[in-house]
A protein has these predicted regions:
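Short hydrophobic targeting helices and cationic amphipathic motifs
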Residues: 4-7
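Helical lid/core segments from catalytic subdomains that handle acyl or acyl-like groups
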Residues: 117-176
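Hydrophobic "lid/gating" helix adjacent to the active-site nucleophile
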Residues: 74-111
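Active-site-proximal acidic secondary-structure segment that organizes catalysis
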Residues: 189-240
Length: 240
C-alpha cells in the first residue's frame, strides 16, 4: 500500500513539474507599433467584432508525405502536425498575438494536438515545441503521448502560443466548425490557429485530404491562409 501511495505521489509531482517547466520557457514577445503597421486599419476594423474568427477549407495532396512516412516508418499524423507547425512558424502573420488591443510579435508557436491511446476512445492532449527535425518530433510526440499525456485542463495551463490540431481519420471531412466560449469577453484575443483534417483518400493515383484552417481575422487575412496552404504543399512535395 505504501508503495502505491509513493508511486501515485511521484506521478502527481512529475506531472506538476512538467506543467511548471512550460511556464519557465522564455519566448520572444515584442509589441508592434500600430501607427507604423500596414494592417492597422484592418486590425481595428475586425476588432469591432466579438468573434472575428473564420474558417477556410482546402485540399492537400499528401501522396509524397504518405510515401515518406511509410519509407521512414514514421507516424503520418505526427508528421503532418510537424509540417503544419513548421509552416505556421515560417509566416509572420501567424506569429502574432493580441492582448488588450495591443499586438505582439512572437518567435514561435508550439503544437497542441489530441491523440488516442491504443484501445481507448477518449482523447488526451500532447503539447510539443518544434524539434530539430521531423524524426525527433515524431519520436518525442510518441514518448509524450505514451508516458506523459496531458488532460484538457493541464493543456490549458500551458501559456505558450499554440497551433491547435485535431483529426477525424474516420471520415472524408469536407469542413468543420470549432467550439468557442462566446461568453468569454476576451474571445477576440484568441489567436491560436486551429487546424483539422479528415482521412486521406485515393483518387487518380494520388492521396489527398481535406484540411480546415481556423484563424483570427484581426491578424490573418485570406492572403495569409493562401500562403499557408501553398507553403505546406511545397514542403510536402519537397520531402525525399
Amino acid at each position: 500500500m505504501a508503495f502505491l501511495i509513493d508511486l501515485l505521489y511521484t506521478i502527481v509531482i512529475f506531472n506538476k513539474l512538467s506543467i511548471e517547466n512550460w511556464h519557465k520557457r522564455t519566448l520572444m514577445r515584442k509589441e508592434i507599433d500600430l501607427n507604423t503597421w500596414d494592417r492597422k486599419e484592418h486590425f481595428e476594423f475586425f476588432s469591432r467584432n466579438a468573434t472575428p474568427h473564420y474558417c477556410v477549407a482546402f485540399n492537400v495532396d499528401v501522396t509524397n508525405l504518405l510515401h515518406f512516412t511509410r519509407t521512414n516508418k514514421l507516424s503520418f499524423y505526427y508528421s503532418l502536425v510537424y509540417l503544419c507547425t513548421q509552416t505556421v512558424n515560417e509566416i509572420d502573420a501567424f506569429l502574432m498575438e493580441t492582448e488588450d488591443n495591443k499586438v505582439y510579435a512572437i518567435d514561435q508557436r508550439i503544437a497542441s494536438f489530441i491523440d488516442l491511446a491504443k484501445g481507448s476512445t477518449v482523447f488526451h492532449v500532447v503539447c510539443l515545441p518544434q524539434q530539430q527535425d521531423i524524426f525527433a518530433f515524431c519520436s518525442q510526440a510518441r514518448e509524450q503521448s505514451t508516458n506523459n499525456p496531458l488532460t484538457l485542463q493541464q493543456s490549458c495551463q500551458i501559456t505558450d502560443p499554440k497551433v491547435i490540431f485535431s483529426c477525424l481519420p474516420w471520415l472524408d471531412m469536407t469542413t468543420c466548425t470549432n467550439e468557442r466560449d462566446y461568453t468569454d469577453a476576451k474571445l477576440k484575443d484568441d489567436t491560436a490557429p486551429i487546424i483539422v483534417w479528415g482521412k486521406y483518400i485515393q483518387k487518380d493515383g494520388k492521396f489527398t485530404l481535406n484540411m480546415t484552417l481556423d484563424v483570427n481575422h484581426r491578424l490573418i487575412d485570406g492572403y495569409h491562409v493562401g500562403q499557408f496552404a501553398q507553403k505546406l504543399q511545397n514542403i510536402i512535395d519537397s520531402l525525399c
